[in-house]
Amino acid sequence: MEITASLVKELRERTGAGMMECKKALTEANGDIDAAAEAMRKSGAAKADKKADRVAAEGRLGLAQDGGKAVLVEVNSETDFVANDDNFKSFVNAVAAAALASGATDVEAVKAAKLADGRTVEEARATAVQTLGENIQIRRMVNVDTTGNIGAYVHTNGKVGVLVDLIGGDVELARGLAMHVAALKPPHNKAADVPADFVEKEKEIELAKMSEKDKAKPADILEKIISGKINKIVSDVTLYGQTYVLGDTTVEQVVKAAGADVAGFKLLIVGEGIEKVVEDYAAEVAKAMQV
């Protein structure tokens, strides 16, 4: 039977395997797509290793919390299709629960943690690779262990998650702050957390942008102008300096009014820092058929 491009594409969509793997399986199965798919499932363990070098930039965040302890884990997949699969969602939630229960503080510890069924997270991940047909990776985890209030929030699409450590105040305020961080994504907590080299660089930029007339002003006046601009920039990049999304005053004012203090926060964004590969499936099929 002729192995057509459409047949290869259909098998790829069913299995998530590479074009060349699909073409080879179809050739060995004499064009029987069901037999080819079954053969590829049987060789799933080998495929799991091959998938490890494929870019996994999609995925979801898993959240688990128990009192003053909470954990966020990032589990990556190759496509949004798999990220929205119920089996993948269940796996992510199970990973988060295992991470919390085990007291894991890094990814390697998460991988070694035991799930409710007795398997390690790593063993379950390898099975998920076979079942879902994509490179699945446990990429990052963050946790908070506090005597204060935890604001835990994961956006409905599972792509952005936040843990806020609030000393004082209440859980409602802590969650509101977590939602704020998820929405505006401030790089820093307070002005004191902003790196000095960032501030100096911004001063240089603001000075360079000034007109010659302004630069000619007395040094004390010039310093006040630049300081005002820098204060605005620092406010924009800090949680405390931003206007609270659920109010009309700054976060600092809201927190202080509650007699509280934000000890810190953790923000995860799925796929952040990963270079995504834009695939041309038509070209990939054509290339596979030429071999």
Curated annotation (Swiss-Prot):
InterPro entries: EF-Ts_dimer_sf, Transl_elong_EFTs/EF1B, Transl_elong_EFTs/EF1B_dimer, Transl_elong_Ts_CS, UBA-like_sf. The keyword Translocase does not apply. Gene3D superfamilies: 1.10.286.20, DNA helicase RuvA subunit, C-terminal domain (1.10.8.10), Elongation factor Ts, dimerisation domain (3.30.479.20). It is found in: Cytoplasm. It comes from the Bacteria. GO terms for cellular component: cytoplasm. Its main location: cytoplasm. Keywords: Cytoplasm, Elongation factor, Protein biosynthesis. Residues 79-82 are annotated as: Involved in Mg(2+) ion dislocation from EF-Tu. GO terms for molecular function: translation elongation factor activity. Belongs to the EF-Ts family. NCBIfam families: tsf. Associates with the EF-Tu.GDP complex and induces the exchange of GDP to GTP. It remains bound to the aminoacyl-tRNA.EF-Tu.GTP complex up to the GTP hydrolysis stage on the ribosome. This is Elongation factor Ts. It comes from Stenotrophomonas maltophilia (strain K279a). The gene is tsf.
